[in-house]
């Protein structure tokens, strides 16, 4: 591997002009990029390669043993951002499955920043390895035997590095690192207030007899560094496939249920079973993108909403409503979206989400996520060109359907994403749309509709990514209005300035700091402020990257950059005038 840039931070050569593409072309480009999840990238080992499948089989074996332990072992999945949300999503699904058999619910999840981070990014949370260790020790306070799975797509999150480092010291724990870079490209930069780099920890996992690195190379993201897309999808594939096979081994099935792929395994090898399950995700991808024109229409409507400073709202139930919440939560750090730009609401609110008595609604408006909250607080002001999207696997959900009808009556555009013929909702007017992907198989095993969920994730990611492209938040295939919420994004911002403006890293750093501190002349304290201090200030910074880009041209003072962006809020348009010509 000669490329010194992390694969997850490398621009995808397929999408270098995605910002100039029509909505239909955007969907085609996303379809091509997503094909790399299964088919692989260049000559690197991919998800369908034997060596990766054999490593994944090792995970199946230890999870099978944990499931058979009758509660004496734990499986802990941990991540930051999208990885943490998918950790929760997966643990929730398989604990529900265990509950149907009256088996101990052994799956646990951890997320940098805690439960509040499921909805809103918590600044700097993933940069603290010590907090990661503390959280892991707490969740394993009564049982220190089992499997720890740390998910970090780019092999970069200090929160995960700390947990892996500690887990390796536990004699009865298996430590698994899941991501999509070669170990050699794990982050080597120093971690604040810690004595190791992520690269050192990754190598320790790789060399440990109780360690396992799962890192199929799935290629760069369609939008550079946006690992919520391919990285998130591949994470879902890997965890669900491994856990489903382990479940089938621990609790043998006597028959295959209707609409499910997995049945009695009998003499089938785990590698063959995994290959079959993963292939079905690829089939689901193909069948989802057959809805190209409908997805493109969603992108058009989403772009109209954002350009008019209106909203995209998701209304759903069960795991499909949760996917809407996850997609919405990813937009502020990725695109600099405001709280109101993209919202998610779920039937039952926090109790349905967490399945415990904790309700975070009192934390503030962003955490009021019930459908009744939408009806009470959002619906009264809904109008054209707001886009309200219902997400119902079976097309049934009286409260969601009623809110869609009420929204349409007030002039909003409405859409229903479903996998069955909808009951009580039809696209009879020009402002309504039904998207119905025709999937061959919906579920891995009963109660885990993995393939329909993956299809939903693809469509929601395409909608919000495409809408933000139309709203001018992407230049070439790079985010140009992301928020500075952790050290990973700080280094990504420096990379954006270096590549787009042709400046060196010290100059890029100086422009970011000037933008962040609202000044043309940095003080000594501002020049030497640690990254953690920049992240803390970056939580409330508006147009941080666009201002830094304009400052890097040498043609703007800070005040002039602010005025230029005030006159033209679509970031891409103003940058077109001032970025260096290639």
Model regions and ranges:
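Conserved N-terminal alpha-helical segment that immediately precedes and caps sugar-phosphate-binding
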Residues: 1-582
